[in-house]
Structure formats: C-alpha cells, structure tokens
C-alpha cells in the first residue's frame, strides 16, 4: 500500500556521521528547517561510522605516509597532508563548539589523545622519513613532530614493537603527541540524540528504494521495513549519506553528474588483541609504509583504540572481497551498479588496476597464520592465541573518468551534487569521517548558495578558521589548536606501561 507524498525541507538518507553532521549544521544555521532522516537499520551509526567498522584515526596526516609522496627529484610533496590536516582542524573546531554548547557534554565519550607515529624499516625508507620530517616541520600545522632512529629511544616510544626485534635493517620513527583516536560511532549516536531533541524526524527501519525529480525538488520512495509498507516523501533538498549504499542511490537520481561513475567494494579485516596486558603495553597509532605495488588502502597500522571506555589494540587492515556495497547489503550490489553509462569506465579500471586485483586476491587467500606473520613485522613476539580476526566495514572505492583517462580509481572522500544543488551524495573512503565537517560545509556551499552569505557569520562563530588558511596564519592556528585541545580535553598524555 502506498501513501500520498509527505513534504519536508530536507531529507537525509543514512544515519551515519555525515548525515548527523549536516543535520546539526543545518539546525544551527536554520533552526526552523524541517528535516527527515531515513535509515534502513535499527539505529544510528551502525555501518561505516560504527566504531568497529573503521580504524578510528583522527586523520590529520600526522602519521599516514600515503599523504606525503616523494617526487621524481627526491623532494617530498606535502600538499595533500596539509589539506587533510586543515580539514581535520575544521572538524575539531565544530566539535569544540558542540562541547561548549553541551551537545557533546563529555568529549572523552568520542575523542581521546593518542600519539601518532610513522615507522619504517630499511635505509631507503629511513631517508624518506627524514626528508618527510624536514618538509613537514617547516609547516606550522605539524609542529612538535620528533624523529628517532636510536633503538633505545624507540624502545621508550614503542616497547612492544621493539621487543624481540632482530632484523639488521635500520629502523626509524616519527612521533607527534597531538594525534587523536575518534569513536565515530559514539559521536554519531550523540548527534542523532541531539537532532531528535530538535524535532528532526528520524525514521529507523526505513530503506530508501528510489528517487525521482518532482516540481520543487525530489520524491523518494521508502520501504517501512517494520510493516512492509511503501511511503513517499518529498523535499527541496536530499542528501545521500548512505556509505557504500550512496552510489546506487545516486545512480537512481539520473542526474548527469552520476554518469561514468562506478564503485568497487573492498571489505576490511583487523586483528584485535584479546590479551589486555599486551594492549596496555602499547600507546600510539603507528602507521607503516605500503609495500611496493600495493594500493594506498593497504597501509598497515597498529592502533591503540578506546571503545566503550576500554583500551583496545588493533592491527590491519587486511582486505577481503565481498560484492556487497554495505556490510548489511546485497550480493547483487556490485553487478547491479554496472550501467550502460559506466560499463566502459569499470572495464577500463579493471584493465588498469591489475595491481589492485592481484593484491585483493592475495589478501583474500591469506590464512590466519599468514596474517599473524604480517603482524609480526610490527610485533615480533606476537602469539596467535592472543589475537582474533574481526570483520570491519565495507568501503566502495570510486571509479570515474577523469581528464587523464577512463576508469581512474579515486582515493579520498568526495561530494557529487546536481548542478541545481537539489541533491548531493557523499562517495569514497579515507579520510572519510575525519573530514565530516569540511565536507558538509562543502555541501552547504554547493547546495545552499543563496542562504550561505547570511549563514557565514554563524559558521565563523562555530568554526573560527572557516574560509581562512591556517597555514598562512600560524598565529591563528596556534590559538585555535590550543583552544580545541583544551575544550576537547586532549591534553592528558598517558605513559606507556
């Protein structure tokens, strides 16, 4: 049975961190705006935003080596690292504003201070890490980064990693204490509780099946999973924030911007330590370097995590393959996403990305002991009985045509929107949730251009560096970073036991 369309101003599809962030921004800027949220699952933050479905790194390019690449002349390109760091500063500022407003009353529920480290082995990699440090140290956003190749110093920083290490290869690491671990699941749930108090209509157990243009906006077809009833809702603006499920819904809009875009799903696996004594001996997020020929998504890291108030230790990611675009998706997701307008894009990517294909096949075939051997490159004394495999979330790597050619694999997070700004979708993977605030500000700029000028003063009140380069204003960065560190309670360094 179908009902008459019910009207509203804004519809948010998916109850993840992106929709939560956009919803809170809109209610701060336009309190009278009528917003509806539709989520297929039973609660908020259960797919990509869930704390067990992502690495929880506050991505600020402090330790992730794939954001700093070496040019042919040996110099280090830090432009991507600077962009990612600037983006994370915007997220920190907005979260700080919400802490002051008591929307996020206890910062420790969703963000914790943790050193971010990069670690490499081998003379060539040590040279690269030194050059990276020199390039980043000249930038105010990366102040306080230390470098060491002294084994005694490294034993203090990362005792678990150095214990039992017998390799003759030189080893080096950088360390910066201003890193964070973010529980995006907890953050998402708190923000949706707040939106509910602001009279946002949140519909769990409601899966969006179709979108079509109507006068003045979009009509969406929704299946109420609880009573198997079809509903129709209309809105002037629709945001598709459904994680891996965003691409199929974007395709249903039929907008020109949705053409020549495909997606390839990659599932993630982590090893989680079940021995609390071992987890207590490590206190950092330590990122290594992807092996030659491996894609950026394969960067191995050993992470201290704070989940449900408990300190955990995870290692990964390992890639798996599933044709599903969501952990709770369908095995038909991949095949049904191939359309006449993107089949050549997908085929071109398949031909170009043989390295990725080889990597995925090798990863899928790994045994538990082979995964443990990869962990032992970080923790030489790791015992199989102390670790379990956990399945993390699905990532859909975007494939699209670019001026450089067909079928280019995209790494990053991007907004695809209609020319008239009436619909926008969030696609991509890392840095993902860390960039929720800057990416949703981009949605506001693209989709609410008429209202934006009148909103800018309020945005700057919430996010003081909005529209300003922090790199070009180091004094402003120092001031804002100190303020957000204090407000978010990120000053307590915890010793390694």
From Swiss-Prot:
- Please list which residues make up the signal peptide: none
Write the Enzyme Commission number(s) for this entry.
1.1.5.4
HAMAP family, from UniProt? Answer: MQO
**An example molecular function term from Gene Ontology annotations:** L-malate dehydrogenase (quinone) activity
Name the enzyme group at the top EC level. oxidoreductase
This protein's UniProt keywords: FAD, Flavoprotein, Oxidoreductase, Tricarboxylic acid cycle
Give any Pfam family that matches. Answer: Mqo
Query: What does the record give as its pathway?
Result: Carbohydrate metabolism; tricarboxylic acid cycle; oxaloacetate from (S)-malate (quinone route): step 1/1
Its needed co-factors are: FAD
Q: Which reaction does it catalyse?
A: (S)-malate + a quinone = a quinol + oxaloacetate
Task: Output the superkingdom of the source species.
Answer: Bacteria
- The keyword rRNA processing is annotated on this UniProt entry: no
Looking up NCBIfam families in the UniProt record yields: mal_quin_oxido (TIGR01320), PRK05257.1-1 (NF003603), PRK05257.1-3 (NF003604), PRK05257.1-4 (NF003605), PRK05257.2-1 (NF003606), PRK05257.2-4 (NF003608), PRK05257.3-1 (NF003610), PRK05257.3-2 (NF003611)
Record's protein name:
Probable malate:quinone oxidoreductase
UniProt lists the family membership as follows:
Belongs to the MQO family.
- Biological process, per Gene Ontology: tricarboxylic acid cycle
UniProt organism field: Exiguobacterium sibiricum (strain DSM 17290 / CCUG 55495 / CIP 109462 / JCM 13490 / 255-15)
């Amino acid at each position: 049975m179908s009902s008459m369309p019910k009207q509203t101003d804004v519809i948010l599809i998916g109850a993840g961190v992106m929709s939560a962030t956009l919803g809170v921004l809109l209610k701060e800027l336009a309190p009278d705006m009528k917003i509806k949220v539709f989520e297929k699952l039973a609660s908020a933050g259960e797919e990509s935003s869930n704390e067990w479905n992502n690495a929880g790194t506050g991505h600020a390019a402090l330790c992730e080596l794939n954001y700093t690449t070496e040019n042919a002349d040996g110099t280090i390109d830090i432009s991507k690292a600077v962009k990612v760091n600037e983006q994370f500063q915007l997220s920190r500022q907005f979260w700080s504003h919400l802490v002051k407003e008591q929307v996020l009353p206890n910062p420790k529920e969703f963000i914790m201070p943790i050193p971010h480290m990069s670690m490499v082995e081998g003379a060539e990699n040590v040279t690269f890490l030194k050059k990276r440090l020199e390039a980043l140290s000249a930038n105010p956003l990366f102040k306080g980064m230390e470098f060491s190749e002294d084994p005694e110093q490294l034993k203090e920083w990362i005792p678990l990693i150095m214990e039992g290490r017998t390799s003759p290869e030189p080893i080096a690491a950088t360390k910066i204490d201003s890193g964070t671990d973010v529980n995006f699941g907890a953050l998402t749930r708190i923000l949706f509780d707040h939106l509910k108090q602001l009279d946002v209509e949140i519909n769990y157990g409601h899966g969006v099946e179709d979108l079509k243009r109507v006068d003045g906006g979009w009509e969406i077809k929704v299946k109420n999973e609880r009573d198997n009833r079809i509903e129709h809702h209309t809105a002037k603006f629709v945001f598709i924030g459904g994680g891996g499920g965003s691409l199929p819904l974007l395709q249903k809009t039929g907008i020109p911007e949705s053409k020549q875009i495909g997606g390839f799903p990659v599932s993630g696996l982590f090893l989680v330590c079940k021995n609390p004594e071992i987890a207590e001996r490590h206190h950092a997020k330590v990122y290594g370097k992807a092996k030659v020929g491996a894609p950026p998504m394969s960067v191995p890291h050993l992470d201290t995590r704070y989940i449900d108030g408990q300190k955990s230790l995870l290692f990964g990611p390992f890639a798996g393959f599933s044709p599903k675009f969501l952990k709770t998706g369908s095995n038909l997701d991949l095949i049904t996403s191939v359309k006449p307008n993107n089949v050549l894009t997908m085929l071109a990517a398949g031909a170009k990305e043989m390295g990725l294909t080889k990597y995925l096949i090798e990863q899928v075939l790994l045994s538990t002991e082979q995964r443990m051997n990869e962990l032992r490159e970080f923790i030489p004394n790791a015992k199989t009985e102390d670790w379990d495999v956990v399945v993390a979330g699905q990532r859909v790597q975007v494939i699209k045509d670019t001026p450089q050619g067909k079928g280019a694999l995209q790494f990053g997070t991007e907004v695809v929107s209609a020319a008239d700004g009436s619909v926008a979708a969030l696609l991509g993977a890392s840095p993902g949730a860390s960039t929720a605030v800057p990416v949703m500000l981009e949605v506001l700029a693209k989709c609410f251009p008429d209202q934006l000028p009148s909103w800018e003063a309020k945005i700057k009140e919430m996010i003081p560096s909005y529209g300003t380069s922090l790199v070009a204003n180091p004094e402003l960065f120092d001031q804002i970073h100190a303020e957000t560190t204090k407000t978010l309670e990120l000053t307590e360094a915890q010793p390694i036991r």
